[in-house]
Amino acid sequence: MKEKTKRKLRTFVCLLMIPVFLTGCRIKTTPLGVFAQILEYASASGSSSSQSSHHGTYHSEPASTPQPQIDYDSLGDIGTVQTIMIYMVGSDLESSYGNASLDMDEMEAAGVDTAHNNVIVYAGGASQWQDRGLDGDACTTLLLTEDGFAPLDTYPAENMGDPLTLSSFMNYCFDFFPADSYSLLLWDHGGGPVLGYGVDENYRDLLTLDELSEALADSVGAHMTKLEWIGFDACLMSSLEVASVLAPYADYMIASQETEPGWGWNYAFLSVLSDRAIPGDEMGEYIVDSYMDYGEYVFDYYPNLYSDLTLSCIDLNAYAEAEDALNTYFAELDTSLDVQNYPKLVRNRAKVRDFGSYSSDMNYGMVDVLHMLELLGDNSDTAKAATRAVESCIAYSDTNMENAGGISICYPYQTDEDYRDACIEMQEYLGFAPNYTRFLQDFYAIQNGDTLLADREISNAHTTVTTENDGTYDESDITLQLTPEQQANFASGGYYILCKAKEEGYITSEEDPRADEMYLFIQGSKRVTLDENGVLHAAYKNNALYMEDDDGVSDIPMILTESDISDVENRYLSFVVLMNFDNWESQAAKLQIAVNEDYPDGIIRNAIPLSDDDDVQSASKQLIRLDDYANMSVAARCSYVTRDENGDLLDFFDWETSKWMMGFEVDLTSDYRTVVQ
């Protein structure tokens, strides 16, 4: 660290243009690589009594229905108004963090009217339980009583990623806990409609949408009834594809478009249960409001645990009309799709609100349906009709995000090709909006282009610099004039900022003879626009973000990627390693940092743990308190300028890497903060 001084980096800007129909596509993608492993969970489950398929693990014999081992008379009257079934897949959320146990504590503290309502939890899927006295090698059914949870039965662990396990639990509840209405709550990780819900830690399995459909058909469908609501206390599950699966079996869906923080739902909502059956839309409003209120309460006390929040109650009885209207709109859009209008379509797609990519390690391709229709629809009659139909099925929703209307759809863009194909396969299997699926197929058929790089130093690029009225930072508009052909083919772009390691004093020629060729990555962004004159604009604030603690300001900037485009702030990700010296525990994490009018020097919103488990790609619900750690390390490797055989500059990420790592440490026990210089 050093004394704080005003400084400017000597930087180098690379502008990237992505045209759209040249051969040899080299568009950057979000690494996925493990999707095939997810589809092959069945073969890795280690269960000798199961049969494998890419749809999951199925028992060769139906799962046995657990029989209660409790004196019902000792519990008082069994409620007849409402039965809420909670399928709690503990996963690492319980084994590592105890979140399932904490939520069960919340349920007990809610003061549920157990005389008229049944709340039954099926708990399993975790390698160990932090509390509650539950066994990681077993599954347990518990009934909420006025004295807390009472175990009904414990038996050897079933695979909670098996649809038979879920249907068996629900049939058990139908048989032993009859009521006027039933609801189902699915608790755990979520991965959106492509990956599905729940991660059984013991069997390495999850429930895909086709498996969820199978489980509901074999339980709700078999009993010729309909659930009042189905809720996901899980990430990324408020989507039209999920709604299509649930619509035959429930009146309402309650779920989040975005990832959820580790604390998940606020189970104080159970206190509203009474001697009347509460309609699903009314209960949905209770659940949404309690979730949002608790989140704001947490953020007031722990600003470094800030998260984007969304929660919606979807009217599944209005779903069919929404799908039909959307299907009609995309039939029209697909007819007009060609290589001439494709670039404009891609530019608009890049602006649509994405979910999950800012708060996880993946690009899930989940976009807000209403925002998508606004940007892609060109104000057409079919787009307006689709918008009205989608709005009509959103019974209630709330959020602290921009452009989060309540329900999403999977529209992969710049994702792994396997993930993209899996999205289409999923939609085809479900019979979901076939014209939309056909549009995606045609969209990807055109998406065969080559990446054209235009690299220019700031000093040579056309730059305008103005000073804000408060004088806190400078604004640079870095521009690049495109040729007519480039303009016609331009789809999307990005830029990254490099600094010269030697000129910044990070390295000397004595330490490395190639020091003059060495650059350090500082910042990357997709905040690039094309104006009506064919000029590409990259808005770069002519400064960088540093860390400051009691020892001063860091020698090098934070390494930032702007992965979420917001109209009200700049949002960055930065990879760090956290350390506790007492037990030498370390945790790789991703900081979410925001710079806005309220925080011109930036603020660390939260820290998300990075999993070392390559098999599991569901979105992380857990957040890290930086105050629980003593030290934070930031490091990046320098690279040498590298050109191809024709002398053309390669993409920075294809440059030759050096042996030199540049970095710094931050004392988290001190008064640390971010600063912009």
Features from the language model and the residues they span:
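Structural recognition of the beta-strand scaffold that forms the well-ordered cores
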Residues: 83-88, 118-123, 182-186, 228-232, ...
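Catalytic-core segments of thiol-dependent peptidases
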Residues: 123-224, 234-236, 240, 257-258
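Bacterial N-terminal signal peptides that target proteins for export
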Residues: 2-13
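Composition-driven recognition of long, low-complexity, acid-poor segments enriched in small hydrophobic
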Residues: 5, 31, 35-38, 42
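Bacterial signal peptide processing site
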Residues: 26-28
